[in-house]
Amino acid sequence: MADKPDISEVSQFDKTKLKKTETQEKNTLPTKETIEQEKQCEA
């Protein structure tokens, strides 16, 4: 591999070939309160 990246492929890139996708909401981590409540229910 060379030290410098090969830009020839990037310059030939065609944005019109990309497909439009629907973005989905990411799963958020539970809060500390939620974790504590779940632990109490299990015990």
From Swiss-Prot:
Kindly list the biological process annotations in GO that this record carries: actin filament organization; regulation of cell migration
Residue spans of biased composition, Basic and acidic residues class: 1-25, 33-43
Lineage of the native species? Answer: Eukaryota, Metazoa, Chordata, Craniata, Vertebrata
Pfam (any one): Thymosin
In terms of InterPro entries, this protein maps to: Beta-thymosin (IPR001152), Beta-thymosin_sf (IPR038386)
Q: Where does the source fall among the domains of life?
A: Eukaryota
Source species, please?
Cyprinus carpio (Common carp)
Which keywords belong to this entry? Answer: Actin-binding, Cytoplasm, Cytoskeleton
- One Gene Ontology cellular component annotation held by this UniProt entry: cytoskeleton
Does Cytoplasm count among this protein's keywords?
yes
**What's the protein here called?**
Thymosin beta-b
Free-text function comment from the UniProt entry: Plays an important role in the organization of the cytoskeleton. Binds to and sequesters actin monomers (G actin) and therefore inhibits actin polymerization.
